[in-house]
Each structure stands twice: as C-alpha cells, then as structure tokens.
C-alpha cells in the first residue's frame, strides 16, 4: 500500500485546483458550435474569476471534428488562439484522446500557448496513453490522465489503470464519471483505491456529471477523500445534464472553509450573463438526461440519441437504454442510428 500521509488534503488546508471545462465538455451542449469571440468572452471571465485552468477544444478533444463526433463551427486552433489572447493567469488546457488526436496536434496546441493537457482513454485502456503522456512531459506540460466511464471498472481495476498513467508520467489521474452514473459511495471507493496505489505526490482529480443530480455531492465526497483537482463548469455547461456546476460547488467549498482562488460572484455573473444564453437546449436533469445516468451511458451521446429518435419516431429514452444495455463507449456514436433502426423495426413486428 502506497504511503498517503503526506498527500495534500483540502480538509487540512491544501488549496483546490479548479479546472473549468465550459469550453470543452460544454462544447457538447452546443453541438461544438461557438464563435471565437464567445470563447474569448467566456475564457476572459473565467480568468478574471480566478479559476486555475481553462480547458479549450472540441468536446471530444483535439481533432475531434468529424462526422462521428460532430463537426465544429471553428477549428480547435481558432478557439485556442481566442482563449490564449485573453487568459493571463490561468493555465490554458486541452484534452486529447489517443486515436483521435495525435502527438502532432498536441505539439501545435503547445505552440499556441496550451501548457496543460488531459490525456483521455476508456477506463480499461490506459496503456494507449503512454506516448501522449510522455510527449507532454517532454514538452514540459502539466499532464493528467483521464479515465473515462469510470463506473464501468471496479475500484481496484480502475486504480491499476491509474497507476499505469502515473508510470507514464501523469502528474494527476482523474476519476472521470462520463456517464454521470457514480453515486457518493462509488466515488469514495474509487478515490480510496487510487490513494492505495498512487504515490503521495501524484494528484487525484474528479470529473463529475449531473445526470443523477449528484455532481456537487460526488465532488464534495471526492475532495473529502483527498482529491485536489476539481472539474466544474459555468452553469454546469456540459454533456448530458452537464458537469458539476462551478458556482454552487465554490459556494459549498466556502462553507467548508476549503481554499481556492475563485470569485463566486464573478463565476455567477459569467454563468448567467454569458453561458446560459448560448444554450439551445437546457442543460438540466430531465427525462432524457436522467436516463443517461440511470443507464450509465456516455453523456455526449445525448444529442446523437435525440437526433436518431427524431429521425425514426422513437422515444430518446428507449434508445439510451438500449445503448446502455449494449455497453457502447465513446467513439461508438455511429452505432446509435443502427440501434434506433433496430428498435423501430421491432415496434413494427
């Protein structure tokens, strides 16, 4: 068992590292369509409000623009450049999925001012991250491992994958609840499993989704268990029912006396004045997004399932339940229309 006594802990005075994902995970909520000017407005407001890092890219990471994931209104580079022009204090961050983005894209993002990257894999496929984590370290970047759909791996197995990412050079590894399926006990078990195997100097992060209305609660539990890096977004802007909303989480952090650098009112203003008006579909818990969490479905599948439901005259929930039963993971969005067609044919029999 790895010694954990010296691990920094928010309950003992360690400062939280608040990573905003409005301009990455939030891209799913806008179908990856936002002008560079709006990116700059959001990034500038976040920088002024004191977040530690701002993640910018297509919702599926660098080079995620495709028919499978959804084309963006602009390139990653246009969005990153817009943010880089106005971010003066926070770390400009991006996301990379090996097999979607390449080392070449990572190097170009670094040249544009990105100094931190999260390398994301499915929760059982950490081994594919070695090259990208290694390259990020060679560039001198802050680098985290991002184990998506963490609910699909038992705590000990997930921790073993986290240990692999640590061995490749990750400064931090996240419990990433992409489906918004984890409950408080499930989060607690996974963070404790990480603590058991990771070096005390390796940070632990939490990325929560709101599909079961547990994102703030899950994040609080994670911090209580030793997490210091927290993902959140303005107005919860993100895939499915959204991410952990940054404003209420910071309010709760204040009530607990946890250290952070954020201005609560500044975050509230940015959420209500800039982000909410951009939403063409409310980012909230409703019958469709709740089904994502209930069935343990990748949150970014929401818009794809809604489109298929409209095309084939189906209930989106039926599609999402079928997706969950088949165990689809990120990158298999193109199978959703096939599932919808099967459901339609079954109804006609």
From Swiss-Prot:
Residues binding Mn(2+): 25, 207, 209
BP-aspect Gene Ontology terms: catabolic process; L-leucine biosynthetic process
Stretch forming the signal peptide: none
Keywords, in A-Z order: Aromatic hydrocarbons catabolism, Lyase, Manganese, Metal-binding, Plasmid
GO molecular function: 2-isopropylmalate synthase activity; 4-hydroxy-2-oxovalerate aldolase activity; manganese ion binding
Pfam families associated with the record: DmpG_comm, HMGL-like
Site label Transition state stabilizer, positions: 24
InterPro entries: 2-IPM_HCS-like, 4OH_2_O-val_aldolase, Aldolase_TIM, DmpG_comm, DRE_TIM_HOA, PYR_CT
Binding site for substrate: 24-25, 178, 207, 298
Domain Pyruvate carboxyltransferase intervals: 16-268
Lyase keyword on record: yes
Disulfide bonds: none
Catalytic activity: (S)-4-hydroxy-2-oxopentanoate = acetaldehyde + pyruvate
Enzyme Commission designation: 4.1.3.39
Active site location: 28 (proton acceptor)
PANTHER family associated with the record: 2-ISOPROPYLMALATE SYNTHASE 1, CHLOROPLASTIC-RELATED, HOMOCITRATE SYNTHASE-RELATED
Stated family: Belongs to the 4-hydroxy-2-oxovalerate aldolase family.
NCBIfam families found in the cross-reference section: 4OH_2_O_val_ald, PRK08195.1
Protein name, per record: 4-hydroxy-2-oxovalerate aldolase 2
The organism of origin for this protein: Mycobacterium sp. (strain KMS)
């Amino acid at each position: 068992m790895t010694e954990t006594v010296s691990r920094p802990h928010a309950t003992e005075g360690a400062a939280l590292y608040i990573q905003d994902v409005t301009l990455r995970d939030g891209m799913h909520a806008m179908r990856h369509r936002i002008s560079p000017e709006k990116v700059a407005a959001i990034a500038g407001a976040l920088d002024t409000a004191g977040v530690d890092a701002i993640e910018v890219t297509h919702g599926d990471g660098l080079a995620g623009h495709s028919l499978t994931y959804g084309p963006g209104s602009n390139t990653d580079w246009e969005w990153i450049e817009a943010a880089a022009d106005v971010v003066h204090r926070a770390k400009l961050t991006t996301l990379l999925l090996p097999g979607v983005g390449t080392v070449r894209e990572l190097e170009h993002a670094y040249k544009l001012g990105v100094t931190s990257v999260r390398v994301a894999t499915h929760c059982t496929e950490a081994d594919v991250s070695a090259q990208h984590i290694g390259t990020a370290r060679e560039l001198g970047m802050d680098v985290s491992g991002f184990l998506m759909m963490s609910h699909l791996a038992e705590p000990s197995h997930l921790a073993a994958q986290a240990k692999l990412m640590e061995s490749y050079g990750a400064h931090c590894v996240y419990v990433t609840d992409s489906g918004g399926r984890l409950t408080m006990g499930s989060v607690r078990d996974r963070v404790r499993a990480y603590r058991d195997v990771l070096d005390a100097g390796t940070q632990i992060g939490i990325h929560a989704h709101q599909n079961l209305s547990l994102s703030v609660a899950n994040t609080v539990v994670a911090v209580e268990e030793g997490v210091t890096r927290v993902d959140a977004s303005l107005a919860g802007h993100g895939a499915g029912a959204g991410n952990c909303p940054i404003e209420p989480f910071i309010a709760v952090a204040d009530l607990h006396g946890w250290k952070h650098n954020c201005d609560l009112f500044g975050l509230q203003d940015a959420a209500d004045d800039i982000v909410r008006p951009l939403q063409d579909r409310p980012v909230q818990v409703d019958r469709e997004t709740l089904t994502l969490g209930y069935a343990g479905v990748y949150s970014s599948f929401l818009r794809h399932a809604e489109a298929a439901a409209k095309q084939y005259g189906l209930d989106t929930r039926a599609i999402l339940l079928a997706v969950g039963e088949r165990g689809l993971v990120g990158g298999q969005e193109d199978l959703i229309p096939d599932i919808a067609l099967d459901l339609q044919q079954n109804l006609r029999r």
